[in-house]
Regions:
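Histidine-anchored nucleotide/phosphate-binding helix
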Residues: 132-144
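Ferredoxin-reductase
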Residues: 3-103, 158-160, 187-188
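Short, conserved phosphate/pyrophosphate- and ester-handling motifs at nucleotide-, phospho-/glycolipid
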Residues: 48, 131, 225
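Conserved S-adenosyl-L-methionine
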Residues: 144-150
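Conserved beta-strand elements of the Class I
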Residues: 124-126, 221
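A short, basic/flexible loop-to-alpha-helix module at the beginning of a structural domain
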Residues: 108-119
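Reductase modules of NAD(P)H-dependent flavoproteins
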Residues: 3-7, 12-18, 92, 152-254
């Protein structure tokens, strides 16, 4: 007697999987929007982590599919789960902007291990564009819980002030905690309608030296597009920073 082979089953994931409703949308910069979702009772995450979001039965889709990974831009102490993204012209982004509030999505996670170190060394955070999102979560959570334990310098590169998400919030956090220094820099000011008297150009060693005492002393965290992340990592190591003191988080074009 031949026994039939049972159909293969997908093993149950070892991380949380749940459905949660979209509660709100908020424009936080030009072509950049935050999406707020309900946070389930008992679900938790660490500042700096990310989740996978799947659209359920969307009205349209494309070759990129219905699943994306997003850093969580909200802090664990906040009441909602927030993700923040550039509004590229994809089916996923169009659906997320258009569906009624209350629409359910599937969320999986949290994942990732981007977190500030515990040692009493200064930190330098280098963000490009939407790569700022995990740093917003980390800084709001840490400063909201008391204060930073060591100096932190946050560099955020954008094309124009119009593109810089959370800039006013970072300035406010810097006034609240003297250990935080915020250094925004703009790379395409001729295309802006704003006046600007801050840093200009891409983040480089010369810019770092203007704001960081002892280039090899801090631990560095880099988040942004892969090309920027790798260029900054190469620059830091060439400047004498130990490669073990460089932590990276790459953001692809989701």
């Amino acid at each position: 007697m031949t026994l039939a082979t049972p159909p293969a089953t997908n093993p149950k994931p070892s991380w949380p999987v749940f459905e949660t409703p979209l509660l709100g949308r908020e424009t936080v910069a030009d072509r950049t929007m935050s999406f707020h979702f309900a946070k389930p009772v008992g679900w938790s995450y660490r500042a700096g982590q990310f989740v996978d979001i799947t659209l359920l039965d969307p009205p349209e889709t494309d070759a990129e599919g219905n699943l994306r990974g997003f850093s969580i831009s909200s802090a664990p102490r906040e009441d909602v789960i927030t993700i923040t993204t550039r509004l590229r012209d994809t089916a996923f982004k169009r659906v997320l902007q258009a569906v009624p509030l209350g629409t359910l999505v599937k969320m999986e996670g949290p994942f990732g291990d981007l977190r500030l170190h515990h040692a009493a060394r200064p930190a330098v955070l280098l963000a490009g564009g939407i790569g700022i999102t995990p740093f917003r979560s980390i800084l709001v959570e840490t400063i909201g819980g008391g204060a930073l334990r060591y100096p932190v310098v946050l560099f955020h590169a954008n094309r124009r002030p119009e593109d810089a998400a959370f800039a006013d919030e970072f300035r406010s956090l810097g006034h609240r905690d003297p250990n935080l220094t915020f250094v925004p820099t703009m790379t395409a000011m001729p295309g802006s309608g704003y006046a600007w008297d801050g840093e200009r150009g891409h983040i480089d060693a010369a810019m770092l030296r203007r704001h960081v005492d002892g280039l090899v002393d801090p631990i560095y965290y880099i988040a942004g597009p892969p090309g920027m992340v790798q260029a900054l990592r190469t620059m830091l190591i060439a400047s004498g920073v130990d490669e073990d003191d460089v932590r990276i988080e790459e953001f692809t074009g989701y």
